[in-house]
Amino acid sequence: MAHSEFSPSQLHRIISCPSSVQLYHDLGVYNEVAPSSLYAEEGTLLHSYMEKALFTSDLSFIPDAEHRTIVKAAAEYVRDFIPKYTQNVKILQEQRVEVPDVPQVYGTADLILYIKDDEVPEACELHVFDYKFGAGVWVDAEDNPQFMAYLLGAVKAVNADTRGKIFAHVVQPRSSCGESKPGC
């Protein structure tokens, strides 16, 4: 899969150091396939489990007990936002999103949930979820350039009514942030 040189996950670096884009070009970074790590492979595996886990409580398809626990916590958090009986819900998993009018800024949102209310547009809700399965670094959704790009792209992807509410969720089941931090 081709990666954007202005991918949402790189925007923090690019905003902090715009010349890094040229440096990465000069070093040929954009032409290389990024090396994988055990952590990246585990994250990819857990993301694939999440795609299935959102729609079932039976997680026996996950062979590892620790992974089952992590995915269960993440799936339960996300499921709390999915309304039970409504026809006006869009759920998009692993959705490519791009910033409107800036097509070189694109990435993949883990989950977009759009709850539309035709009668009361202000009651519409757009939720964008990003799964972070690592244990080391806390990622905040607030003032996060990656999320700003995902949110703009999600509005476009579902043609969201922007008079409603828009939420960013960083789902970090391995964090020890407690209930006071949004996105736990």
Question: Whereabouts are the PLM-identified features?
Answer:
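Short, polar/flexible loop-turn hinges at active-site or ligand-entry regions and domain interfaces
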Residues: V29-S37, D58-F61, A135-V139, A157-N159
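Nuclease catalytic cores
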Residues: H3-F55
